[in-house]
Design a protein with these regions (language model features):
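Repeated scaffold domains used in trafficking and secretory/extracellular systems
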Residues: 24-38, 73-90, 128-143, 175-188, ...
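Beta-strand-connecting loop/turn residues
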Residues: 41, 50, 91, 118, ...
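Residue position within the beta-strands of beta-propeller blades
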Residues: 1, 44-46, 94-97, 147-149, ...
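Long, acidic/polar, low-complexity amphipathic helices and coiled-coil-like
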Residues: 14, 25-149
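Surface-exposed loop/turn elements that mediate protein-protein interactions on large endomembrane-trafficking
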Residues: 2-23, 51-74, 105-129, 154-176, ...
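Catalytic-core helical/loop segments in enzymes performing group transfer/polymerization on anionic/lipid-linked
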Residues: 95, 232, 248, 264-269
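C-terminal regulatory/effector modules of DNA-binding transcriptional regulators
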Residues: 95, 137-139, 148, 159, ...
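Loop/turn-rich, solvent-exposed surfaces of beta-rich toroidal or solenoidal domains
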Residues: 218-243
Length: 313
């Protein structure tokens, strides 16, 4: 279900104004199965109901329209294999499809789909090695580039690709990339990321050099970069015994630190960062808490009111 909050508010409502709607089926305006994005005054999503389709809707959740059917992956027997990862970027849906691994020459299919016309282009066909499977994590998009892992070639490490979304070609491969490294963010052709066991790093593409900006010997870190801040959720080891949330400004000055406690069985996950809040979940999906970014010197988890308890009439 799609939920929304008014600007400056942390109270979420179901995006549906149908009278007496129970918000529990595909007939609800807010119903959406996978993927969600915004572009040029419309909302977009992907539905798996009967057809594998990209849909467009108005900002109030009404007038659902099919833009196009997403490319289907079929095995040697012609059976359909649907699903994958979905990223909305600058008027396009970037779709990393599940390859049919029963095919001996399978490789990861990557598509660029124009949101308003449905025009579809397959990317990186000439560059992605055979037997490249769908990456469950480590994928990011920024500044016109897709970053994603390639098949592992050595113990604990895997090549990491930088693909140009305009040309459809892979331009760079980081050969020595640990699975525990964070995803990459590209600002003005400088790459930002956390390297496991090393710290927060910058990579100058023009010079081909990496600089460690904040040395940090932690096992793993989720990172969220904004125009003004950097937020990290660090884990001390593979046992996940200690989890710390750190806030820095873009000059790498530490602004705040919070030792997280488990909520249920897990430490909270970083999910979304906006101008008004850093949102966290306890299951890697459902937002349950937020942090006020205006008080980073005293980081505090604030629990959201259950968004499923209300609807917008």
């Amino acid at each position: 279900m799609i939920h929304f909050a008014e600007p400056g508010s942390h109270e979420f409502h179901v995006l549906c104004n149908k009278p007496n709607c129970g918000h529990a089926s595909a007939d609800c305006n807010a119903f959406l199965e996978v993927a969600f994005g915004y572009y040029n005054g419309h909302l977009y999503g992907v539905t798996l109901q009967d057809h594998f389709e990209l849909i467009q809707m108005d900002m109030d959740g009404t007038n659902h329209r099919v833009i196009t059917q997403l490319p289907e992956q079929k095995d040697l027997s012609g059976n359909f294999n649907g699903g994958g990862s979905y990223f909305f970027d600058n008027g396009y849906l970037i779709f990393l499809a599940f390859p049919c691994t029963s095919n001996p020459d399978h490789a990861l299919p990557v598509y660029k789909i124009q949101l308003e016309t449905g025009e579809t282009t397959q990317l990186f066909q000439e560059d992605i090695p055979l037997l490249t499977d769908w990456p469950a994590d480590g994928v990011s998009i920024s500044n016109g580039y897709l970053y994603f892992p390639l098949p592992q070639t050595s113990e604990g490490k895997r090549p990491y690709a930088e693909g140009n979304l305009e040309t459809g070609r892979i331009e760079r491969v980081f050969e020595d990339w640990k699975r525990e490294n964070s995803f990459i963010v590209n600002f003005d052709n400088v790459l930002y990321y956390h390297r496991a066991g090393v710290g927060l790093c910058e990579y100058d593409k023009a010079a081909g050099t990496e600089t460690v900006k904040v040395p940090m010997d932690v096992y793993y870190a989720d990172v969220s970069y904004t125009k003004d801040y950097i937020f990290l959720r660090t884990l001390d080891s593979a046992d996940f015994n200690q989890c710390v949330l750190l806030a820095y400004d873009r000059d790498y000055n530490l602004l705040g630190k919070l030792e997280l406690e488990k909520i249920g069985l897990r430490f909270p996950f970083l999910e979304y960062t906006t101008a008004n809040a850093i949102y966290l979940s306890t299951d890697g999906g459902t937002i349950t808490h937020y942090i006020d970014p205006h008080h980073l010197d005293r980081l505090e988890l604030i629990q959201l009111v259950d968004p499923t308890a209300r609807s917008h009439g």
